[in-house]
């Protein structure tokens, strides 16, 4: 089973914020695949189906961003999902709004949700789809920025990136991730 994990924060107040770009991609995939989420005992929302002949699961941790690993590790253990079958989708300050970047592995880059996953999974070697949200201007605090909503100028580019990231995830269901990475990072 492939597990797609979108990082974000639960609750209405965080919907459509920069930090919830991962949730937005997962929601787009659920819409495309016509599946609904159920709350799990692992402190997350999960939906699963068979797509292109492969079992897939979508996960939105409800632990808040900084504790995402507390949801994902037990879920992986329960369903016997190998780290090679996990793809994590999240926001990235170091990419401009609307840009996506796929990676096979890497450090947290200062992202607390990724730090939590690295800690709980015991490895940095999991696949990622990063959604660019850009950096704050005018000395705005990073916390306020990532928890803020996209500006009108950013919105179209980011929504296009959400769709493109969902396309990459769909392709990764049956295509080797390195090949998907080469195509979508071009």
UniProtKB/Swiss-Prot annotation:
Binding positions for tRNA per the UniProt entry: 14, 64, 66, 112
Disulfide bonds: none
GO molecular function, one term: peptidyl-tRNA hydrolase activity
Enzyme class: hydrolase
EC id: 3.1.1.29
Record field: catalytic activity: an N-acyl-L-alpha-aminoacyl-tRNA + H2O = an N-acyl-L-amino acid + a tRNA + H(+)
Pfam families, alphabetized: Pept_tRNA_hydro (PF01195)
One record GO biological process: rescue of stalled ribosome
Active site location: 19
SUPFAM superfamilies to which the protein is assigned, alphabetical: Peptidyl-tRNA hydrolase-like
Role, per record: Hydrolyzes ribosome-free peptidyl-tRNAs (with 1 or more amino acids incorporated), which drop off the ribosome during protein synthesis, or as a result of ribosome stalling. Catalyzes the release of premature peptidyl moieties from peptidyl-tRNA molecules trapped in stalled 50S ribosomal subunits, and thus maintains levels of free tRNAs and 50S ribosomes.
Subunit structure: Monomer.
Protein's name in the database: Peptidyl-tRNA hydrolase
Gene field: pth
């Amino acid at each position: 089973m492939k597990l797609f994990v979108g990082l974000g924060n639960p609750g209405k107040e965080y919907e459509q914020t920069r930090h919830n770009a991962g949730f937005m991609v997962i929601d787009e995939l659920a819409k495309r695949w016509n599946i609904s989420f159920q709350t799990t005992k692992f402190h997350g929302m999960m939906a699963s189906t068979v797509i292109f002949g492969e079992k897939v699961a979508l996960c939105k941790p409800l632990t808040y961003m900084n504790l995402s690993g507390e949801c994902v590790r037990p879920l992986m253990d329960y369903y016997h999902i190998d780290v090679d079958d996990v793809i994590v989708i999240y926001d990235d300050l170091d990419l401009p709004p609307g840009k996506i970047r796929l990676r096979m592995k890497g450090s947290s880059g200062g992202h607390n949700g990724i730090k939590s996953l690295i800690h709980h999974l015991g490895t940095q070697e999991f696949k990622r789809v990063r959604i660019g949200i850009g950096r704050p201007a005018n000395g705005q605090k990073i916390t306020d920025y990532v928890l803020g909503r996209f500006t009108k100028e950013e919105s179209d580019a980011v929504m296009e990136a959400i769709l493109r990231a969902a396309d990459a995830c769909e392709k990764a269901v049956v295509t080797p991730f390195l090949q998907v990475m080469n195509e979508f990072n071009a």
